[in-house]
């Protein structure tokens, strides 16, 4: 696959012979936020953490951050290898989309604090949105 997007920074740790785990950070974060988790896992797994486009050490990107581009970046990081994808927050959405679009590359998915707004049980509004609505529009 040819990747024509921005340069994506990634770092790998652990024995290359071990199963691969890729850590995908959330919005308003970067791969450094996954460093402690990476260090806990890299004794038993090959761990990749990367900065999503526009974050950390990856090429600055003005947006929009569409899901197809985020998944293409993850596929670039995988480089044809099959992995368990661990996603935090928006990174969980990237992990789920990658699993749906590239099941041959995804051995499993673990997500936490991931917004699932398309699910019928997801709250229609957040406390912040409700507070803004209650306060009215600024003049």
Describe the predicted segments one by one.
Residues 2-60, 67:
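Conserved HGGG/HGGXW glycine-rich cap/lid loop of the alpha/beta-hydrolase fold
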Residues 20, 46, 82-84, 105-108:
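Structural signature of beta-strand start/N-cap positions in the alpha/beta core
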